[in-house]
């Protein structure tokens, strides 16, 4: 039987939601992750230090794992102050601020309409050593949804990188060859997270033979040439790329609807799904760096010191999983997952 023991991984991009669903989402993500960076796009968004610490307390109240710790982020708005950034940084629990272009994804209406409006805040973040996380898509209606990431790189991200060379930036959940190349060619302060579903699937999986709403996420799945570029980046051993699931649950009826929500749920099997990708590429030896080393190294945090063991043993993912008083349909629902965490 094939086994693989790696340093305990972290998830550098996770949605836990809030309220009664935390019992389920914290359980799923806390099974084997050491840390998870929690996204702030609640309703209302997590824009203050007090809100972030209160949210952390609600998460910890449901946390049954001694080895799992949530790291928090602030939702960056055009009303965010430098004082708030300094206060957040001083807590030791809030490690980043997230830039959402207004309207780019779930609960992003409070986001930034013009990045120049937050330049004073980015200057403070650069001075304080707080990381900037970016949802890298433009939101103007004249730009095709499949081109929004590429346009963002050229018109928004490149100027930020140029104007704030000491600011550490994570381009979240990249979906294109263009984004992978941008990160590779940028300086040492630019990195990216990559999701399991963008490595495993492309837009054909979502659209051919009927619309598959549980593959619908933002940024949207792209063509297979972009998928393969992401696989190459993730499995290459390049320290600029690391694990961020963007596991984003919505209740079953909110996905299977005339106007369904964006987000795919992978927290039930995240490291197992990544292992499939690395095995398929013959790069299992690089999984540990991607999942367990590159993220904490970029964040200047210590690596986890304990381990988990994966076994090459297929199991069937559940058709649905508990999500508070409702249900979520996970990726690979009713289908085989090739690896199992023992």
From Swiss-Prot:
Cofactor list: Zn(2+)
Any one Gene Ontology cellular component term annotated for this protein: cytosol
The keyword Metal-binding belongs to this UniProt entry's keyword annotation: yes
Binding site for Zn(2+) 1: 13, 15, 98, 246
Enzyme Commission no: 3.5.2.3
Pathway: Pyrimidine metabolism; UMP biosynthesis via de novo pathway; (S)-dihydroorotate from bicarbonate: step 3/3
Enzyme class: hydrolase
GO MF annotation terms: dihydroorotase activity; zinc ion binding
Record's catalysed reaction(s): (S)-dihydroorotate + H2O = N-carbamoyl-L-aspartate + H(+)
Modified sites of kind N6-carboxylysine: 98
Binding sites annotated in the UniProt record for substrate: 15-17, 41, 135, 218, 250, 262
Family as reported in the entry's similarity comment: Belongs to the metallo-dependent hydrolases superfamily. DHOase family. Class II DHOase subfamily.
Protein function: Catalyzes the reversible cyclization of carbamoyl aspartate to dihydroorotate.
Subunit structure and binding partners: Homodimer.
Protein name (Swiss-Prot/TrEMBL): Dihydroorotase
């Amino acid at each position: 039987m094939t086994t693989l023991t790696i340093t305990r991984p972290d998830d550098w991009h996770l949605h836990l939601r809030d309220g009664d669903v935390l019992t389920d989402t914290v359980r799923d993500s806390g099974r084997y992750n050491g840390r998870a960076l929690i996204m702030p796009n609640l309703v209302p968004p997590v824009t203050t230090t007090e809100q972030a610490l209160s949210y952390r307390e609600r998460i910890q109240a449901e946390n049954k794992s001694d080895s799992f710790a949530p790291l928090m982020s602030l939702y960056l708005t055009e009303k965010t102050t430098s004082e708030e950034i300094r206060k957040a940084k001083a807590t030791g629990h809030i490690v980043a601020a997230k830039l959402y272009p207004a309207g780019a994804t779930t609960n992003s209406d409070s986001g930034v309409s013009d990045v120049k409006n937050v330049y004073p805040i980015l200057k403070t973040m650069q001075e304080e050593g707080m990381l900037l996380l970016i949802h890298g898509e433009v939101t103007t209606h004249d730009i095709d949804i499949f081109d929004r990431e590429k346009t963002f790189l050229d018109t928004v991200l490149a100027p930020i990188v140029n104007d704030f060379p000491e600011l550490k930036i994570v381009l979240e959940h990249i979906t294109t060859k263009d984004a992978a190349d941008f990160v590779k060619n940028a300086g040492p302060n630019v990195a990216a997270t990559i999701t399991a579903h963008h490595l495993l699937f492309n837009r054909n999986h979502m659209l051919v033979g009927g619309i598959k709403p549980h593959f619908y996420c933002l940024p949207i799945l792209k063509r297979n040439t972009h998928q393969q570029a992401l696989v190459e980046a993730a499995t290459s051993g390049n320290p600029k790329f690391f694990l961020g699931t963007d596991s984003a649950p919505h209740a079953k009826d909110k996905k299977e609807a005339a106007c369904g929500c964006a987000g795919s749920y992978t927290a039930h099997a995240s490291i197992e799904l990544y292992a499939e990708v690395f095995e398929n590429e013959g790069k299992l030896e690089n999984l540990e760096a991607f999942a367990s080393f590159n993220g904490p190294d970029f964040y200047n945090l210590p690596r986890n010191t304990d381990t988990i063991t994966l076994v090459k043993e297929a199991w069937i993912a559940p058709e649905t999983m508990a999500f508070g008083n409702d249900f979520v349909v996970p990726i690979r629902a009713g289908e085989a997952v090739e690896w199992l965490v023992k």
